[in-house]
């Protein structure tokens, strides 16, 4: 976890500003048009039905559609015949917001490698790699900073999946609200189409089984987007300053997801005045699939 300090159990992020010191390698820039139809497709993929003038909190992930170097898109003319895109374990995702993304604007994305670090865990040596994306408006002002964190583990991604399936389940905590009911493969595909993440492990059943998985599974970012609905239902879009968390377990076809949003009171930093929250998401068996923190203005 990075980008701020802990207040209790909640991380309060610093102001959103582009920072050249946070890149660990070359970056590239490209345009990100925020089109009404694209936002509506994203909304429908996460269970919303009404058009909105602001994009959902995790819509910035859809920059992948416009990134000319994005790797989780089938190569033209060969599909995945030359092998799958690199499949590391997506363990964390973080968004810092200066303001909501507005339908109709065109942003400039700068994308590249961020921080790198290592540690030793129960599954062996772990190498963490951060991908950083900064979105700026036509005035050059920061709008959103997004950080995707992968881990390279000694154990395979499929082996780690089996370990997750073997975890002991707990009773679903009280106060949870349903954010998705009996997720289907169709919804996985809807999200892939809206977000631009076409990794075949999320939609190609035969391929997933050949690579050691029990079935296709939901993109982690779909779980996060569904969780964000519970947060914005409570605090709205305009107040949101940060939203980030860790993926604890995969989500499978047929799962129903429940989220709990807990407010922890006001933050005590003058440059981050607002409220701090934790957000946890569970499946129908009480298994923790995602846990996050958020702050508001």
Each language-model region and where it sits:
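Mid-chain, well-packed structural core segment of small domains
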Residues: 84, 234-244, 251-253, 259
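Hot-dog-fold acyl-thioester-processing enzymes
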Residues: 6-92, 157-239
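HotDog/MaoC-like acyl-thioester-processing domains
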Residues: 4-22, 27, 92-93, 97-180, ...
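Short, glycine/charge-rich beta-strand/loop segments that flank catalytic centers
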Residues: 54-56, 245-249
């Amino acid at each position: 976890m990075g980008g701020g300090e802990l207040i209790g159990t909640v991380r309060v992020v610093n102001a959103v500003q582009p920072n050249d010191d946070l890149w660990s390698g070359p970056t590239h820039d490209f345009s990100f048009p925020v089109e009404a139809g694209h936002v509506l497709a994203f909304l429908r993929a996460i269970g919303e039905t009404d058009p909105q003038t602001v994009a959902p909190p995790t819509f910035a992930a859809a920059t992948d559609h416009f990134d000319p170097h994005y790797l989780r898109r089938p190569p033209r003319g060969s599909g995945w015949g030359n092998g799958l895109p690199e499949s590391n374990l997506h363990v964390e995702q973080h968004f810092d917001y200066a303001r909501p993304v507005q339908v109709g604007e065109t942003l400039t994305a700068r994308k590249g490698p961020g921080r790198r670090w290592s540690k030793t865990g129960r599954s062996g040596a772990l190498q963490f790699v951060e991908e950083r994306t900064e979105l700026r408006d036509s005035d050059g002002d920061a709008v959103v900073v997004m950080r995707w964190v992968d881990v390279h583990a000694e154990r395979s991604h499929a082996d780690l999946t089996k370990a997750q399936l073997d975890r002991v389940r707990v009773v679903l905590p009280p106060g949870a609200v349903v954010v998705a009911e009996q997720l289907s493969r169709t919804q996985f595909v809807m999200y892939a189409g809206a977000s631009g993440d076409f990794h075949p492990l999320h939609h190609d059943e035969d391929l997933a089984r050949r690579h050691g998985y029990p079935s296709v599974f939901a993109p982690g970012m779909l779980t996060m987007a569904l969780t964000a609905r519970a947060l914005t239902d409570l605090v709205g879009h305009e107040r949101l300053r940060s939203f980030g968390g860790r993926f604890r377990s995969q989500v499978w076809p047929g799962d129903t997801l429940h989220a709990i949003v807990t407010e922890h009171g006001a933050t005590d930093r003058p440059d981050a005045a607002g409220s701090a929250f934790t957000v946890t998401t569970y499946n129908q068996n009480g298994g923790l699939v995602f846990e996050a923190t958020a702050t508001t203005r």
